[in-house]
């Protein structure tokens, strides 16, 4: 919050006054991260209509979907601070009484729809695959945050290949 306030030329209190709550500021930061993540993936996939992807109406090849996810993990590997912030908030929000609980429920549901949509044209069970992809991403990121020497991208590529093979897919 302090860094964001400084970048905006405001005090912490001034920033929170304009946004509403500390959680609101954090959600704004995470929403901006999501927008950047979509842009990273779109830079690989071309002109992506994310609403069509989310609805399962896009026709992405397995190769394109895997390349987009690889680019996302590669991008995340360059920003441990925001990945750490996200992981901490996501885990704190497991408690139903946490002010961000509903936010993370909605965000996970949205992410699962995006991932399922990316594989809708190729996977026999895209919703199952999307849940495994999300679990893999979150789990590997947490391991990488604890053990920075872990090659996040290489480990991701290998594990995703194994998951895809379990769904009868290959790149």
Show where each model-derived region lies.
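Generic hydrophobic, amphipathic alpha-helix propensity
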Residues: 4, 29-33, 37, 115
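Short helix-capping/turn signature of helix-turn-helix
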Residues: 19, 88-96
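Conserved acidic functional residues
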Residues: 23, 33-34, 138-142
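Hydrophobic alpha-helical connector segments
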Residues: 28, 41-82, 129-133
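Amphipathic alpha-helical packing segments from all-alpha helical-bundle domains
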Residues: 38-39, 62-67, 78-82, 97-121, ...
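Hydrophobic/aromatic-rich alpha-helical bundle segments in the mid-to-C-terminal region
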Residues: 97-106, 120-171
